[in-house]
Amino acid sequence: RLCNVVFFSPEDLGIIKNGPSERRRFVDMELCQLDNFYLYNLNHYNKIVNQRNKLLKDMYMNPDLKETLTIWDMQLVSYGSKIIERRKLFVEQLNEIIYEIHKKLSGGREEIRIQYEPDVELDEFESKLRNSQDRDMRAKMTSVGPHRDDFSFLVGDVDIRTVSYTHLTLPTTSRV
């Protein structure tokens, strides 16, 4: 008879107590293992963000480069939109699984869920990126896109990022 084992370590709490980049990394690692298309889009998106950031830095010495920013923005929106769509779907699917598992573990006393908090909505991505160009040029970095997304972990309506870490059991449930 086989038994499923889930390893849980204190480092797993980093998904909750550390910053948004840790939560994005967790979701991205899971999605990259499940979906090669997501991996492809994420790799291209990250390369474009890096190229765009380099361009923003280079524009300080050569302002004429601003004309090429729109080309990078179009690619950023194209790959970034696919990332946003897939993350939304992944969180919806994960919530269905977590709900059933946690219901059995807790006897239905509480509901848990993950909430996806995209930095930008799909229908606003292009305009927000365009409107951020001047700010991005001053900061020399891209300030809009899925590389700024976050995820909340909710028990009932309480965001457990804001509660004592000694009471957290969500990472165990989400890894089952």
Positions of predicted regions on the chain:
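Compositionally biased non-globular segments, especially hydrophobic aliphatic-rich helices
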Residues: R1, T172-V176
